[in-house]
């Protein structure tokens, strides 16, 4: 069973042919697609998309790149929306949340402080409702981990993970799986490929981050990623590990269901 644990299917890049993209994913054997929100403005859209497609599920959260334009009452709105969604079997997590220190303008000073405050507040919401989190950890792994350790008891996915071995172990010890996607398909992505090859499948999940992070076979200025490419990511991971794609699909799907337990009701 193939599961794309991170796909921004609501993005405008899919507005012209979203139904065709979904059909391609289904034809490629993708049983479930997790669609994370990026802010208050698309909570309803990700919910509607999830309900309108086979195997669609959604997460609610405020992405660190959009925290700058968010207001404190967006956190209140998030909590209210989460509470109202707890009976919805298509709602599986809090996300996409976390920290981004790659973008220099938001990596220091007041912008960074706001990022951390919103991240911590969203971890509080996840803890209150017993939900997993989908984490954005770009150049921020240690501080993301620091907040997780303060909260304790949370679990989920470190999306598009590209940290050190020590950082990988830190997330795993906190109950998190690591998201493996298109970046792993590039031979020069040595650190990501090492994690993908050496860590047990019980610590890995597949993702696309579509329309972003296209795999090597799509890498060009005019190429967008799609959820159906998770099948190719699974094949590339199988080749890297010297195993078959069925083993990869089964192992990573089992991990996804463990860290996102509400997903079970949709794929059962």
Residues covered by each model-derived region:
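Mid-domain alpha/beta scaffold segments of enzyme catalytic cores
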Residues: 1-268
